[in-house]
Amino acid sequence: MPENRSYNDELNFLDKIDANTWRIKKGFVPNMKVDGFFYVNDLLEKLMFDELRQHSRAAGFGGFLPAMKQIANVAALPGIVQKSVGLPDVHAGYGFAIGNLAAFDMSNPEAVVSPGGVGFDINCGVRLLRTNLDERDVQPVKDELAQAMFDHIPVGVGSKGVIPMGARDLEEALEMGVDWSLREGYAWAEDKEHCEEYGRMLNADQSAVGSKAKKRGLPQLGTLGAGNHYAEIQVVDEIFDDYASQRMGIDHKGQVVVMIHSGSRGFGHQVATDALVAMEKAMKRDKVLTNDRQLACARIHSPEGQEYLKGMACAANFAWVNRSSMTFLSRQAFAKVFNTTPDDLDMQLIYDVSHNIAKMEEHISFQLSTTLLVHRKGSTRAFPPHHPLIPVDYQLSGQPVLIGGTMGTCSYVLTGTEKGMEQTFGTTCHGAGRAWSRAKSRRNLDYQEVLDRLAELGISIRVASPKLVMEEAPESYKNVTDVVNTCHAVGISKKAIKLRPIAVIKG
């Protein structure tokens, strides 16, 4: 990598293509096979370039590389096709930036799979449940409802699940995904239809998962965890697309919904950690070179690549069972407070999307249909109307895409577009994206002030670790509306619904 290249020298490799699109040209980092691209508006653009400027001044010392460098390093991986893409919520992460997606040609024997392109929280994702309740029904019992959710769902760093499960159950759940939840009575038949991959990755093989991962996962099923994970009671604030909203069962402002954001907990983290160790050895054996050690990878068809994909699929299934379990517990909490059944409250699952995953998909590449391994890290699948992999209910409106905001700010529901299939392998943003590091948030914000501000906004909050609440304060993140509007302007997704929180449950 060029030593201490000045900020102005770096700019020579960056081209602004239109109001929202930048290209990172080959040469920005060594060995780039394809160009990098990123999508921003003026405000998000400033954040990206400030990060690059600081990195140039520090002569490359410090924590993670800037997101632009990470997007470019991914463009240097073997077997990548077309481009490495940074979405508007992109920010520095481990290996891949969070909000970075890339696709690799499955027919190319050199092509790789990289755990850093999926992340440690495999299938961290979001699901949205609708209800037939109105804000006026919920406001008088908002605190009681928040407390009931907090009591029903185990939250926080070391939280243990309440879903009874032995080692055999776990192994079955890892391979069956939502089908396990359905069999055990924790999910409704309709839930499965409204999950990405129908809630089950078929290539999952529990024998590919080490005992340490299973040991970590067993007590954590049906738990929310900490960090940016949450359950929120939200209200429909704005409807941008009447038809798409009606397909989802959302027909008026003020309708109450529930959003659950969680992943594969310690289980997914261990699967990723184990794979990185195995892949470092495989890279030496197969002489695979990368620009960044954090981009440890293995050829897709190598034993290590296949083992990781099987283990990753298990972690994805774990996360779907986890969110299904929390859906069951949320339905119970609502039923208790309103003294009725979840059925009578019409607590149907609108959709469940993954934000951290690698999947084999058919895409048109150079006018040919090609099987690609699409790595989506901090990004969301967003397939258009008529795509064969989305449910019948959404065939005419496009796949729902769930975008969680930050604590106390709005969230969005988008739909996938044809342009997204062409530009970003059917992918859009996943949320707000961090603007400050967790350490900076803790230094600059007071947790009591953050909690008081939420109370002033009329948001009922229950937090297991209040002293960590600054890390998730709105100031710590980019503005989710900027992110969503940029994706809408570029045309890779379309706005359908805006949601605002009235109660937040956090780890």
UniProtKB/Swiss-Prot annotation:
Presence of keyword Nucleotide-binding = yes
Give the cofactors, semicolon-separated. Answer: Mn(2+)
Query: Which positions bind Mn(2+) 1?
Result: D121, C124, H229
Provide the residue positions that the database annotates as binding GMP: 228-232, 355-356, 404-407, 411, 430-433, 506
Q: How is the cofactor bound?
A: Binds 2 manganese ions per subunit.
Q: Which GO terms describe its cellular component?
A: nucleus; tRNA-splicing ligase complex
Q: What EC number is given for this enzyme?
A: 6.5.1.8
Q: What GO molecular function terms would the record report?
A: GTP binding; metal ion binding; RNA ligase (GTP) activity
Which residue ranges traverse the bilayer?
A: none
| Catalytic activities | a 3'-end 3'-phospho-ribonucleotide-RNA + a 5'-end dephospho-ribonucleoside-RNA + GTP = a ribonucleotidyl-ribonucleotide-RNA + GMP + diphosphate; a 3'-end 2',3'-cyclophospho-ribonucleotide-RNA + a 5'-end dephospho-ribonucleoside-RNA + GTP + H2O = a ribonucleotidyl-ribonucleotide-RNA + GMP + diphosphate + H(+)
Keywords attached to this entry: GTP-binding, Ligase, Manganese, Metal-binding, Nucleotide-binding, tRNA processing
Top-level EC class, please? ligase
Q: Which GO terms describe its biological process?
A: tRNA splicing, via endonucleolytic cleavage and ligation
Against InterPro entries, the record matches this protein to: RtcB (IPR001233), RtcB-like_sf (IPR036025), RtcB_euk (IPR027513)
Outline the subunit composition: Catalytic component of the tRNA-splicing ligase complex.
Other comment: Ligation probably proceeds through 3 nucleotidyl transfer steps, with 2',3'-cyclic phosphate termini being hydrolyzed to 3'-P termini in a step that precedes 3'-P activation with GMP. In the first nucleotidyl transfer step, RTCB reacts with GTP to form a covalent RTCB-histidine-GMP intermediate with release of PPi; in the second step, the GMP moiety is transferred to the RNA 3'-P; in the third step, the 5'-OH from the opposite RNA strand attacks the activated 3'-P to form a 3',5'-phosphodiester bond and release GMP.
Q: Of which family is this protein a member?
A: Belongs to the RtcB family.
**HAMAP family tied to this protein:** RtcB_euk
Under what name is this protein listed?
Answer: RNA-splicing ligase RtcB homolog
